[in-house]
Amino acid sequence: MASFKLRAVGGADRFDEGECRKSLALIWPPDEWREIRALPSGRCQSLQGDPDEVIKAIADLVDESVYWCINPIQPNAKHANKSTVLRRDWLLFDIDPVRLKGVSASDIEKRSASLVASRIVADLSGRGWPVPILIDSGNGYHLYYRIELPNDPLAQSAIKKALVTLAERHDTPEATIDRAVHDSPRIAKIPGTYARKGAD
């Protein structure tokens, strides 16, 4: 499977700054504003994509799972929501193994998610789509496809249809595509930060 690959690593009190910087260079231009958010607390900060400033903000939140809004928001907006997202820059496929809720994926389970991700890339590449950014999300895989769409209902409908179509085509009993990640203020785990879900 041809792709850019980033991995999710880290421990309870650290993160991989190098992986974070790689992802920033690929996904978050320095002049764009995004929200980063810690879960489950909901602590958040909106800022421009200056790598040093973003790394500082992430470092303040790494005691929790840290996410970013995948699409740009209005300058100085306090939060990412439907009214503050400027446009849609990324189509996200979130592939996870089927497992008990709140339990970390085993290596075998992650392999099943990897196979589904590979099938998606092969399918879309055969239809002329570009190479995506592949991210190890800790318990599964994310595929980021670059798009240029407005933040409007028609774009949301198109993205929702794409997710459903690919899920119907490639879901397996062992791993599935999340069909719900079609909202414009969608957040996703920042590469290089710790995937906190269940026991290690």
Sequence positions of predicted segments:
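A generic structural signal for short, non-catalytic loop/turn and secondary-structure boundary residues
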Residues: 29, 60-63, 84-86, 127, ...
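Alpha-helical structural motif
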Residues: 16-20, 50, 54, 116, ...
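Conserved short beta-strand edge segments in small beta-sheet-based binding/regulatory domains
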Residues: 67-69, 168-182
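Helical (often loop-to-helix) elements that flank the catalytic cores of nucleotide-handling enzymes
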Residues: 102-125, 147-175, 196-200
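Short glycine-rich, low-complexity/disordered patches
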Residues: 32-41, 129, 176-184
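Histidine-centered divalent-metal-coordination microenvironment in nucleic-acid enzymes
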Residues: 90-93, 124-158, 185-195
